[in-house]
Amino acid sequence: MKNPFAHLAEPLDPAQPGKKFFNLNKLEDSRYGRLPFSIRVLLEAAVRNCDEFLVKKNDIENILNWSIMQHKSIEVPFKPARVILQDFTGVPAVVDFAAMRDAVKKLGGNPEKINPVCPADLVIDHSIQVHFNRRADSLQKNQDLEFERNRERFEFLKWGSQAFCNMRIIPPGSGIIHQVNLEYLARVVFDQDGCYYPDSLVGTDSHTTMIDGLGVLGWGVGGIEAEAVMLGQPISMVLPQVIGYKLMGKPHPLVTSTDIVLTITKHLRQVGVVGKFVEFFGPGVAQLSIADRATIANMCPEYGATAAFFPVDDVSIAYLVQTGREEDKVKHIKRYLQAVGMFRDFSDSSQDPDFTQVVELDLKTVVPCCSGPKRPQDKVAVSEIEKDFESCLGAKQGFKGFQVAPDHHNDHKTFIYNDSEFTLAHGSVVIAAITSCTNTSNPSVMLGAGLLAKKAVEAGLNVKPYVKTSLSPGSGVVTYYLRESGVMPYLSQLGFDVVGYGCMTCIGNSGPLPEPVVEAITQGDLVAVGVLSGNRNFEGRVHPNTRANYLASPPLVIAYAIAGTVRIDFEKEPLGVNAQGQQVFLKDIWPTRDEIQEVERKYVIPGMFKEVYQKIETVNKSWNALAAPSEKLYAWNPKSTYIKSPPFFESLTLDLQPPKSIVDAYVLLNLGDSVTTDHISPAGNIARNSPAARYLTNRGLTPRDFNSYGSRRGNDAIMARGTFANIRLLNKFLNKQAPQTVHLPSGETLDVFDAAERYQQAGLPLIVLAGKEYGSGSSRDWAAKGPFLLGIKAVLAESYERTHCSNLVGMGVIPLEYLPGETADSLGLTGRERYTIHIPEHLKPRMKVQIKLDTGKTFQAVMRFDTDVELTYFHNGGILNYMIRKMAQ
């Protein structure tokens, strides 16, 4: 069908009549000029892709009518311009694509129809671990080990880049996906097939929102949704409310962008922005560099919004020039955005659009801070950290509590390391990592850390040798400017050598701690601390032996590493005493904003971006040497423990089955609030006594070769065994943290997988009970695929994180939500009942269903199928089944 809005297309430049754009001003609709800039991007995509099938004229009217429709939970389609993936989520996506080709062939279709129809960039950044640190060859040794362990996965990805059109792989060692996206992949405006249109994307990583800082609308989705977008399906989303976040004033000279983002995170958590867009405006925005904006946008999942948008302005255009983008392209970007009403001047309040609600922050009120000890939204001023940690020590087990008895608060343990004696206590820092795209993309905080290191070394300070220090930049550009500016040797002297280019400590790839340190922590039952410049510090994520983890700016990471403890008041106590007996305070070595900016102006230059990125796809010799098969259908190796054909499509036929009620289901797990996708499907180490470890041992592997759960996401047998295998999982059936549950028919306590297997062998369906914010954290598709493989038919929770809810639907698992004001406690549910959930044949979005217990009690819950499209996926047994049936016909 012809696009009903084709008449809006006109040339941007009369000298190039073949290159057109959809001029939304020709809609001659006064509502357009009042729309938030982020909603204008949704509108343009709908107008350009309107076909009266996937995108209808009524959708465009609904978006234009945003001021009214934002309150009505109206569903709109969005076709992003591209998709980005990292390797932990990218491997299972390519596995699914390979299995879908097999399934289409089996159903009599053409397997080569399964191909990305939009650009898909996969950046390998999640596999490298900090095994070696504090040595000049750390980088090479970690990269060699990464290749040795992941060769099979990398060969598979290389096969994928050759077998599928439109798929580009950025090799390992290049950097972190979101930083590479910001510095290199982002187009800001596409110039393709004779048409200009805004760059937009979804990514299989929740911190995809970082690109919103450059004015490119994007957010994280589950791997399952991303696969559908790659196959040409729009994302079906509820038209979001947009919170206007007004920034005013100027930050204090000692405040970093990290302090600003941690302040905003806490503030927006309190406002409540889940499922909404946040759009930044006000004169304060012009004070922020693109790196600062990207840092704020990066932590969007931590404050719970879907996107955190900074419209494009002159600062964005200057950044494109600074990062070596072609000047001619940059001119067209500005010209297009001005023509279509998407270019912003933050000092001109007449451009301010309508918002659902406006909240404000005066940047001069921001103080240096950290977040912790267990959640990114728990901001604590640096001046309060010592007091806060001590109150957490004694407080009841929880987000702000470790429940250490008062007479044990001063416990300590001595140990020998490298022939010297050291002492650890509660609050001792054992990991200090400058890591994560959140901060390493920001030259001001990275150079701030470098200058602080220089002053610390010159003042005679050092870091104790047992502290696991590391520096893992998000791109080669960082190393380039740290080296050129002369601060690199000082960072190395304090133990912050470059250990790899990847996510590393931020995602739990922190590697092992020295054995004597682990023994001291476990024997002393100590609350040891990790300090990192990352974006998440959920319990059990950073390292199993650091029960407290604080997010901090890179300079503060170094400061706490030198202090060796978080139980310090930097105002009153020195960081350390040098060889001359002089006390050195933090204020003596903290660099000012002016000092940092002077170095940044001199050393962060376009030439360095061009030099690093023009060879990014060819510079890794190990990658270039990999052999990969050339067939279009993948030849599965039955002996592989990394890549396995998944069972999702084995019994798939072309015919649809009517939905079935869930009868007499047992509760596999009875969980509380804030169960993260890390709890459901951990990404870190595979514990030696776990079901996944037994599976690998039975196949002849030793613990050294187990690798991490994240690296094994191409193997469903391991991932099913890793589901709910987080050691910090708190199950009400047990009243303790353990990856275990009670098998209700026998009363035995078993590993979660073993219990689920018993239920499945007996043909018994399962459900999970949970509290608020179920599935918060990473957009991890295995947190939905894993429960599906365990035989879980539904989850009953008080509320869900948006991405996880869609992922459950995408796998055919029913997300049920208690009615407002009701909870498991208010209904008197113990989880030991059996549940029958009546599923009617004709379903509607957000329909109420009847739940009956074997005790005779009945109550209602809402089925969280929010859109008609989600219902279609459910009827098909999931989104991928729907796509296969479509491609096979």
Swiss-Prot record:
Keyword Membrane: no
Cofactor(s) the protein requires to work: [4Fe-4S] cluster
Coiled-coil residues: none
Cofactor binding mode and count: Binds 1 [4Fe-4S] cluster per subunit.
EC id: 4.2.1.3
Alphabetical UniProt keywords: 4Fe-4S, Cytoplasm, Iron, Iron-sulfur, Lyase, Metal-binding, RNA-binding, Tricarboxylic acid cycle
InterPro entries tied to this protein: AcnA_IRP_Swivel, Acnase/IPM_dHydase_lsu_aba_1/3, Acoase/IPM_deHydtase_lsu_aba, Aconitase/3IPM_dehydase_swvl, Aconitase/IRP2, Aconitase_4Fe-4S_BS, Aconitase_4Fe-4S_dom, AconitaseA/IPMdHydase_ssu_swvl
Binding site for [4Fe-4S] cluster: C437, C503, C506
PROSITE patterns with a match to the protein in the record: ACONITASE_1 (PS00450), ACONITASE_2 (PS01244)
Any one of the GO CC terms: Golgi apparatus
Top-level lineage group: Eukaryota
Subunit structure: Interacts (when associated with the 4Fe-4S) with FBXL5. Interacts with frataxin(81-210).
Assigned protein family: Belongs to the aconitase/IPM isomerase family.
Protein name: Cytoplasmic aconitate hydratase
Gene name for this UniProt entry: Aco1
